[in-house]
Regions:
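A short, structured loop/turn motif at beta-sheet edges
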Residues: 71-73, 103-111, 147-148, 323
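Beta-strand-rich N-terminal accessory domains
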Residues: 1-99, 116
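Solvent-exposed residues in well-ordered beta-strands and their adjoining turns
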Residues: 81-83, 103-105, 116, 156-160, ...
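Short, exposed beta-strand/loop patches in secreted or surface proteins that constitute
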Residues: 64-71, 132-137, 269
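Extended acidic/polar, glycine-enriched regions
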Residues: 118-120, 126-184
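Generic recognition of long tandem-repeat/solenoid scaffolds
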Residues: 76-80, 100, 134-146, 276-278, ...
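Beta-propeller domains with acidic blade repeats across secreted/periplasmic ectodomains
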Residues: 170-456
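Surface-exposed beta-strand/loop patches in extracellular or lumenal glycoproteins
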Residues: 95-121
Length: 456
């Protein structure tokens, strides 16, 4: 779940912040490297460069709670709580020094922050304090006492004495944080209108994907959702969310622009009256654009009490929300539910490479792939406490199996809610990952356990 950040104007150092311990688990000169296996997405990232320090283990402080992070141009500010004190923590660096500006947003008698180091040659000092009676570093912790509202301090962490270039870094940390647009490029990528085949009344339009883009990002698309104004949000496996505009009657003025980035393999977007939600391997985010410039500047943690694994053939798939405001998603072989109080529970298990997600306000569907203990791909109507085959015990029946001639690797499932679909309104469309086709899903709920079928 670590969040890696490039620090300094010229990428002087990198740091990895751990939301599960509210600490920096590594600082190094360099960046990260991904293994080539499965496009680099089935193994964890590795440090590439020379570490200053790494922490193999770190614990969450008592009453600690990670809240998310903010973007101010190149500046990243992590936000969390320890007890009743809300804290903002901004890392920065020069070539020889790692800095943290820590803002204590409310009054407190005493606060203890993690600041563990593994190299005795690295020294900790405080070069700027405001609204704090006493501050010290001891036994891997920063201890501040007599804290006034909106107090702050700047920590200097280095093996060396102060260099002349540090004055610029300190001035940067003391300066006002301003919301700034980071990606000004708007890519015009016209779409293509489809034509009905034969006597069909249905056509398939095409939105062209900007594979050649200024950020050199790989456009492996994973999920999409529509905003109330008709614009779309599209996620990519490497970690971007794109805003797609101009989806109208002729598709001549379709544009793509970067909306958010930095996710760990996002494969789930949900939009409703509560906001824009994104699921990645270790967290559900609630995204905020605070200044209306069509870029996300506040990445709020909605829930992160699940997941965190460094290797897998499969991923984390979602994100379906039922009428009770609960989110449903799949991670590895298990099915999870995050309730409106933002707590997550495993509710079912035994699914194999289960990337298919769908359902309605009243139920949740999951679609595993054929293979071990899964005789053929299937659609499951998930019931709490059930097992669905991969463990080889107590196998519960699916809504339906999908014959191999129809689909060999299921994708998502979509409820048809528009009357423009004519007689298919209220039905479900299944999408094939394996063959790029689609089919109709039928559901009969007249018996004790719903049953279904697929129609190519």
């Amino acid at each position: 779940k670590g969040i890696c950040v490039k620090l300094g104007y010229d990428h002087a150092l990198s740091a990895c912040f751990d939301p599960l311990s509210l600490s920096y688990r590594a600082v190094w000169d360099g960046w990260v490297r991904f293994e080539p296996f499965r496009w680099g997405c089935s193994r964890g990232a590795n440090i590439e460069g020379n570490p200053w320090f790494t922490l193999n283990k770190a614990e969450m402080p008592e009453d600690g709670n990670y809240l998310g992070f903010h973007r101010f141009g190149k500046r990243v500010v992590f936000e969390y709580e320890i007890g009743k004190t809300r804290i903002q923590d901004e890392p920065w660096a020069t070539k020889n020094t790692f800095f943290r500006r820590i803002d204590l947003l409310n009054q407190s008698e005493k606060i203890t922050l993690p600041c563990k180091l593994t190299d005795e040659a690295i020294k900790v000092s405080f070069i700027e304090t405001k609204g704090i009676e006493d501050i010290r570093w001891e036994n891997g912790e920063i201890i501040a006492e007599g804290i006034q509202k909106k107090a702050y301090f700047i920590v200097r962490i280095s093996k060396e004495s102060a260099h002349s270039d540090e004055a610029h870094a300190i001035a940067h940390l003391k300066s006002e944080r301003k919301l700034q647009k980071r990606w000004n490029e708007i890519l015009k990528v016209p779409g293509k209108l489809g034509k009905p085949a034969g006597t069909s009344r249905y056509a398939i339009d095409t939105l062209t994907v900007p594979y050649d883009n200024p950020y050199k990002t790989v456009m492996q698309l994973t999920s999409l959702a529509f905003l109330p104004n008709g614009n779309a949000l599209v996620a990519t496996l490497p970690g971007d969310i794109w805003l797609v505009k101009g989806i109208d009657q002729d598709l001549k003025n379709v544009t793509w622009q970067r909306y958010a980035t930095g996710f760990n393999q996002p494969i789930g977007i949900h939009v409703d009256e509560d906001g824009v939600f994104v699921l990645d391997r270790g967290q559900i985010y609630l995204l905020h654009d605070r200044n209306g410039d069509e870029e996300v500047d506040h990445y709020e943690k909605y829930a992160n009490d699940f997941g965190s694994y460094d290797r897998s053939h499969t991923h984390t798939f979602g994100l379906h929300r039922t009428a009770d405001k609960a989110f449903h998603f799949i991670q590895r072989t298990d099915i999870f539910r995050t309730d409106r109080d933002r707590t997550t529970q495993k509710i079912a298990s035994g699914v194999r490479n289960c990337m298919g997600v769908g359902g309605t306000d009243d139920y949740f569907w999951a679609a595993p792939q054929e293979g071990t203990w899964t005789p053929t791909s299937a659609i499951l109507e998930v019931v709490r406490g059930e097992e669905y085959g991969l463990a080889g015990k107590n196998i519960s029946a699916p809504l339906c199996f999908i014959p191999r001639g129809v689909d060999n690797s299921t994708g998502g499932m979509l409820e048809v809610t528009s009357d423009k679909w004519g007689p298919f309104m209220g039905s479900h469309i299944g999408l094939s990952y394996g063959s790029g086709t689609h089919y109709l899903i039928l559901r009969d709920a007249t018996s004790i356990r719903p049953q279904g079928a697929v129609v190519p």
